[in-house]
UniProtKB/Swiss-Prot annotation:
Compositionally biased residues, Polar residues: 1-11
Source organism phylogeny: Eukaryota, Viridiplantae, Streptophyta, Embryophyta, Tracheophyta
Limits of the LOB domain: 32-133
Any one GO CC term of the record: mitochondrion
Family statement: Belongs to the LOB domain-containing protein family.
Entry-linked Pfam families: LOB
Sequence intervals crossing the membrane: none
Tissue specificity annotation: Expressed in young shoots, roots, stems, leaves and flowers.
The protein, known as: LOB domain-containing protein 1
Domain of life (superkingdom): Eukaryota
Region annotation Disordered: where it falls in the sequence: 1-27
Annotated PANTHER family: LOB DOMAIN-CONTAINING PROTEIN 1, LOB DOMAIN-CONTAINING PROTEIN 4-RELATED
Length: 190
């Protein structure tokens, strides 16, 4: 009985009335077990491999990974990796476990397949839209060229009409063509 009271005294910080800072606690005092240890109903050790990646506030994260991979496999996998890669590995395991629960046959490969198929469909739609855009640009340029040609033809017809109706009628005598030729003769016979 004495050992239990000693253990509780050792983990409880002593508060003194002096202005000195409280004594420092050991490097990682576990106040609440990590989600993994809580779900596995075991004591969370000070150097628990799972504690940094499965906080007590998110037990569903460990539950999903544990359901697919198993706790011993997760621990073994994390111990083989350097600490810098463990966070990404845990996130990947949780993602793969969620995908496996959603699609037990294909897992994350099924999700990847669906995403690749969606990308292919979107690329086909994009190519079709680009072809339609090129066709519309071609039609627009043809229409502009047609409008320009019609406008030029209309201007030319107007110019021809105005030239024909010009006031040069005083030079020719429509009633007598011989008399008009006589009028011009003196200019060339000089």
């Amino acid at each position: 009985m004495e050992s239990k009271s000693d253990a509780s005294v050792a983990t409880t910080p002593i508060i003194s009335s002096s202005s000195s800072p409280p004594p420092s606690l050991s490097p990682r005092v576990v106040l609440s077990p990590c989600a993994a240890c809580k779900i596995l109903r075991r004591r969370c050790a000070e150097r628990c491999v799972l504690a940094p990646y499965f906080p007590p506030t998110d037990p569903a994260k460990f539950t999903i990974a544990h359901r697919v991979f198993g706790a011993s496999n997760i621990i073994k996998f994390l111990q083989e990796l350097p600490e810098s890669q463990r966070t990404d590995a845990v996130n990947s395991m949780v993602y793969e476990a969620e995908a496996r629960i959603r699609d037990p046959v294909y897992g994350c490969a099924g999700a990847i397949y669906h995403l690749q198929r969606q990308v292919s469909e979107l690329q086909a739609q994009l190519a079709k839209a680009q072809v339609e855009m090129v066709n519309m640009q071609f039609q627009r340029s043809n229409l502009l060229e047609l409008i320009y040609n019609m406008d030029q033809q209309q201007k030319q017809e107007q110019d021809n009409m105005s030239f024909e109706s010009n006031d040069l009628g005083f030079l020719e005598d429509k009633s007598n063509t011989n008399s008009s030729m006589l009028w011009w003769d003196p200019l060339w016979t000089c």
